[in-house]
Amino acid sequence: MGSPRPRWGRRLARLGGRVRRSLGSVDWILSAVPGWAPAYLALWCLILLSDALSEPTLPAVRGVSLVVLAILSVHAIGQRWRGGFSKHDGAYLVLMLLGAVGSFLDTAATPLFAAAWIAGTVGLDRRTRDAPALTRCVAMIGVVGAVLSRSPWLWNAVNRLAVSLTTALFSWAGGGGLGASASGLSALLLVSPCLVWAAVRGQRHRFVPVVTAIALFLVHAGSSSLFGFSPRHRLAVELVYVALLLLLCVGVVRGQRRFAGVRRPRWWAVVPALVFLFVFACGMSWLPELAPGRRYAEPRIVLFVDHSLLGSWSTPADAAPGAAFSGANFGQFPEYAGAAGHRVVTGYEIDEERIDDVDLVVIINPGAPFSEEEKETLYAFVKSGGGLLVLGDHTNMGGIMDAVNGLTAPLGLSLAFDSAVSLDPGWSRALCVLPPFSERFRPIDVPVSIGASVDAAVHPAVAPFLVGRRAFSDPGVAENIERALLGNLAFDRGERYGDVVLAAVRYLGRGKVALFGDTSVFQSSALILSYEFTDGLIRWLTDGTGAWRAPFAGVLALLLLFGSALLLDRPDALVSGVVAIVFTAGVLCGTTIAVSPKDVGPMTGPTALIDAGHGNLIRWDPLHTSGVEGLGVNLARNGFLPFVHHKGLVGSLPSPQSVVVSVAPTRSYSQREIRDLLEWVEDGGGLIVTTGWPQSTALAPFLADIGISVSPVPLGAVRPDVVSLDVQPQLPSAWPLETSPEWAPLGSVEWDDARYTVIAERSIGLGRIVVVGDNGVFLNENLEGKDYAYVENTALLSTLLSRPRGVEDPS
């Protein structure tokens, strides 16, 4: 008799048995569905992860797609487990693992990661006789999706083609004007390689799939355009359209079984092609990205030209409470540029002498046309390496459109006589950020509002970089003078819908010209969110990298499409997965190089960091009642330059003469953040925290370290007595504070024969910490918004900001 199996061996055997039974159960479930169902599900998941639909992919939909792919992977592993692994299966397992890990990272290469994941899964499943054709289709969907999302010039050409086609076909019936995603052209292009291969390789009825797909596109575009569906119905129609396209692809794949038994690839011939694929993908992603030049970190000289500005250069300090959000105020744009290290110059004239030593010229809402001499001066300035930033607004209010188009139309950029309107209350779901800003900024960092759309010509040197996906173009009404020539701001049939360009750039010589159809991003009330974007825009427009980069990136994108198609011609599943992984590596390498951190230095002067990196209960829709624009305006009135910070506080704290305001954080500070915060306060910093008892549990470790806690006694709306304040502020939902002797009460309220502290202060070193027992006192609805202000609460904030620091007894 042999020696008994050790305990760990028995446990391992039991674990293996459980795994086999689990895999067997999944395999039994999937064996009940038709043989084409796994391939159909995989294609569906890939389309959803490619974000090719007009409706942005919701996180829940993305999560379901990843779960479905995981189930298909378990099914494939179960098939191999029961039949026995071979020496070739290790490569498929590696593909599956790499693709699965990358798909959960939510990067620019997510569709390619998913394609590699599916290729590995299909390669492991021995019952998939259509593996070569299926994985070839999957890989090309990932490649086409990545190329369209990484090449703004190519995306613009496809989008203009969709608008022209739908307008030409359906304008006679009052329809047309659909963008690439809304018309279904993006989805058709994703699956087009599969259909083209079917036409090339087929024998009988080879063109039937292509003709059928085109017919589906026309039916979908026509119904979406002519019937003017609501967003909910539009999405349903689009899902049916994509479902039929994918059924067509599955049918084509199953019709190519005779090519399943191709010979193994000659890797000595494939490897050089893969190297070129990696280099081209890296170049396509790197060339148009942010600031690849050596000058990125250097400060710029920025000239703000007042060319009969329709607006004002006022700042919040110039406006009375409640009036800061009325009108177009740009006074803080130069202030933020100066705080970022740039030298700001202002002027009224455009001539060679004035702009000779300038890096960037900024023109906002020009109310007068440009002379030919001014145009030629600006064109020559840009060609020599300068940057030109032109900001306009909706319709032709005040003649802005005529003045702007007279300057930028010869360059292929112009403002439309319309208003670009989001279907959502804000632009958080509607806005799509394209390269060169897609990897560094989110829609929340670019708070656009209602402005004009930008007509970007199809030109190798013209590229959009801000697009409204769920948005429409509402034509202006020249007779509606009382409402600034606006239309009805509602979507009507026949209006341009989907993929509306909001900002674009023209590469010219060694410089760039950027045109925005909306000035909201650069107004004083929005710069607390957009300050990093505007600084990146200033540096990118003036990096002097040359106009050849954009056309060359477009050429690389086209070469990648043709090269990938040739490389995937009749391969096996392994080659398809390797192509997807190599393409992924190139895209990630290019974007990593381009967006690697650049040392531009912190913002200078007294600043106010509004913490948004700890689950703070703040809404980011423009002027939302739970927003913080009013807080930013009041911080500016008190001499601080405010900015919202969405990341952690480690290494991000401003200078000690500044202040940090944390509104209702629901996620705890790390030990490193607590240590850095306390050291920063000791050096002279000021920290203001507003929190109620429900939110204070997240801050318990930090509050315990500094000797304070929030009591679970709801006081409701109260008006406390505040030290050094003649008026009583309004706390909408107050909670009492329990403090150690080091704390001094600043605000207290008498309730039920007891006095409760609701505002307390503690000095630590040269700085101080203030805690307010109310999570919403400094939100817009309780502080300041458009045409209203609670002067008692603005006075409270001013008092807290102006109190001396480093004093032991503030009372």
Q: Where would I find each of the regions flagged by the language model?
A:
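Short, surface-exposed patches at the edges or C-terminal ends of soluble domains, predominantly
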Residues: 261-811
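Hydrophobic N-terminal alpha-helices or hydrophobic patches in metabolic proteins across all domains
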Residues: 2-279
